[in-house]
């Protein structure tokens, strides 16, 4: 599973990008997106790091298949 950023909720603060251990978060077309192929939800860290730093509730959520 991977995480996803809601483009409508994201404030483009950039807090998530530097904490992503897989480098899956990139700025694309003026919004941050998470590469689902490389995101592993920080499996070995207990919880996704992006969730811990995002100032907006429900901006980053598990990607629906």
Curated annotation (Swiss-Prot):
InterPro entries noted in UniProt: 4Fe4S_Fe-S-bd, 4Fe4S_Fe_S_CS
Q: Where does [4Fe-4S] cluster 2 bind?
A: 20, 39, 42, 50
Residues annotated to bind [4Fe-4S] cluster 1:
10, 13, 16, 54
Q: Which GO terms describe its molecular function?
A: 4 iron, 4 sulfur cluster binding; metal ion binding
What GO biological process terms are annotated to this protein in UniProt? nitrogen fixation
**Cofactor field:** [4Fe-4S] cluster
Q: Which PROSITE patterns match?
A: 4FE4S_FER_1 (PS00198), 4FE4S_FER_2 (PS51379)
Is 4Fe-4S tagged as a keyword? Answer: yes
UniProt remark on cofactor binding:
Binds 2 [4Fe-4S] clusters.
Q: List, for all copies, the residue spans of the domain called 4Fe-4S ferredoxin-type.
A: 2-29, 30-65
Alphabetical UniProt keywords: 4Fe-4S, Electron transport, Iron, Iron-sulfur, Metal-binding, Nitrogen fixation, Repeat, Transport
Q: What is this protein called?
A: Ferredoxin-like protein in vnf region
Q: Which organism is it from?
A: Azotobacter chroococcum mcd 1
